[in-house]
A protein has these predicted regions:
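Walker A/P-loop NTP-binding motif
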Residues: 1-2
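Flexible loop/turn segments at secondary-structure boundaries
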Residues: 16-17, 96, 133-137, 159, ...
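ASCE P-loop NTPase helicase motor core
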Residues: 101-159
Length: 217
């Protein structure tokens, strides 16, 4: 809709964000898309500024220093002096980046630095990713009301699979294990060393025992 827009795609590391740019590149090279938007897309990809490394530039009137779409790493490869109308944070948190409190803080601090890469008007920011730890960078953003969470999981409210057949999801859960399944498929991370309550741990008492028989702490 706006060929003048500049977009920075941020992932935890640069190599991951380049994969997203390559996917966009293939889509923009589709002949059918060019026939719909010949005033924006190139009939033949240009030799310069049409790669995951250099970024992608569509036909535009302005001449900003930023490509139309550019890959960026959050903790490695953050651009210097670039300012984007839209920053897309996709997979800025990984399982490895939540292995220690120091790694979590490194990601959180890098995200703060990336805020300077917005335009003077502030720009927009989108976030998409998977939770791997209850105190990860995403939780910090939620606590600060820096974003509005929209959680999409593999089940509906009745516990029925919306992603694949129920038997396949059950098998996947068994093979993944509860901790990985909770993070990857339910967006409910459980930190290392932490335990969640299970229903069968609780007992229902119809009558309270005498106070002298209770342990007090």
């Amino acid at each position: 809709k706006n060929p003048e827009i500049t977009i920075g795609i941020f992932s935890h590391v640069l190599s991951t964000s380049k994969k997203f740019v390559r996917q966009i590149q293939r889509a923009l090279e589709d002949r059918r898309l060019y026939e719909l938007f010949p005033d924006v897309l190139h009939e033949k990809p240009p030799q310069r500024f049409w790669s995951a490394d250099a970024g992608l530039i569509v036909k535009r009137k302005g001449n900003p220093k930023e490509p139309t779409v550019q890959a960026a790493g959050l903790v490695d490869g953050q651009p210097i002096g670039a300012h984007y109308d839209l920053r897309v944070y996709d997979d800025i948190v990984t399982q490895e980046s939540t292995s220690t409190p120091e790694q979590i803080e490194k990601t959180t601090s890098a995200r703060k630095l990336s805020l300077a890469l917005a335009t003077a008007a502030g720009g927009r920011a989108w976030y998409a990713g998977t939770r791997y730890h209850p105190m990860d960078t995403y939780q910090t953003l939620i606590d600060r009301k820096a974003l509005k969470p929209r959680v999409r999981i593999c089940m509906d409210k009745d516990g029925q699979s919306v992603l694949m057949a129920d038997d396949k999801l059950k098998k996947l859960r068994t093979e993944m294990g509860e901790r990985t399944f909770a993070a990857q498929m339910l967006q409910q991370p459980v930190g290392e060393g932490m335990r969640t309550f299970q229903d069968d741990w609780f007992q229902t008492l119809e009558k309270l025992p005498a106070p002298e028989k209770l342990n007090r702490y």
